[in-house]
Design a protein with these regions (language model features):
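Transmembrane signal-anchor/signal-peptide helices with a preference for the extracytoplasmic
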Residues: 17-39
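Short extracytoplasmic/periplasmic juxtamembrane "stem" segments immediately C-terminal to an N-terminal membrane anchor
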Residues: 34-51
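Alpha-helical segments in soluble extracytoplasmic regions
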Residues: 54-115, 143-167, 173
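Surface-exposed, polar helix/loop patches in the mature regions of secreted/periplasmic/lumenal proteins
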Residues: 103-133
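Short, Lys/Arg-enriched, disordered terminal segments
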Residues: 1-7, 172-174
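Hydrophobic membrane-insertion alpha-helices, especially the h-region
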Residues: 4-23
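Extracytosolic low-complexity repeat regions of secreted or lipid-anchored proteins
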Residues: 131-148
């Protein structure tokens, strides 16, 4: 009789404890996902800050070969931002086409091999520097303290990205 009561008690405890354990596990899993999204955002921000610094440094470039590092960081910035878009969803975070447009512009400059940059090509890099200074300011404030995308900042980011993309595409079509 005592064994039977003990068995019933254990079953009741398991029936109560198991759902509580599942709820705690679910909460911790969501927290872990949120933390990983914040870390991914920090990586993406770091990549874009590096890209911005390289754009600034590239204003002093004298030939097309010196733009290789800028091209590589445009790619890594695009790569990290695309993964951030995948993590948050493209309905919450905009894709940034300007990274690929920067790559295309540099590739176009380098098609003729290593040559001196023309003054108008350096002027394009100077315009990119101005634009990316604004993009960095917006990107730094893209996430709220709890790790969610701030839609007003995302809208600003989308507008700035469109301006840069349209500018580069216009130049690429010349």
């Amino acid at each position: 009789m005592r064994n039977r009561q003990m068995l019933i008690f254990i079953i009741v405890v398991l029936l109560v404890a198991w759902p509580i354990y599942q709820l705690v596990d679910l909460y911790l899993a969501k927290k872990s996902e949120k933390d990983s999204n914040i870390l991914l955002y920090q990586v993406s921000l770091f990549q874009i800050e590096l890209l911005n610094n390289l754009i600034y440094d590239s204003m002093n470039a004298s030939n097309t070969e010196q733009l290789n590092v800028l091209k590589q960081f445009a790619y890594t910035s695009d790569y990290s931002h695309q993964h951030l878009v995948l993590a948050y969803g493209d309905s919450k975070l905009t894709n940034m086409n300007s990274f690929l447009d920067i790559m295309q512009y540099i590739i176009r400059l380098q098609l003729g091999g290593d040559r001196l940059l023309k003054p108008e090509e350096v002027a394009v890099i100077q315009e990119l520097n101005k634009a990316f200074t604004e993009i960095i300011e917006v990107y730094e404030n893209l996430l709220s303290e709890d790790g969610k995308i701030i839609s007003s900042q995302n809208d600003k980011l989308m507008q700035l990205d469109e301006v840069v993309s349209e500018y580069l595409r216009k130049i690429l079509l010349e």
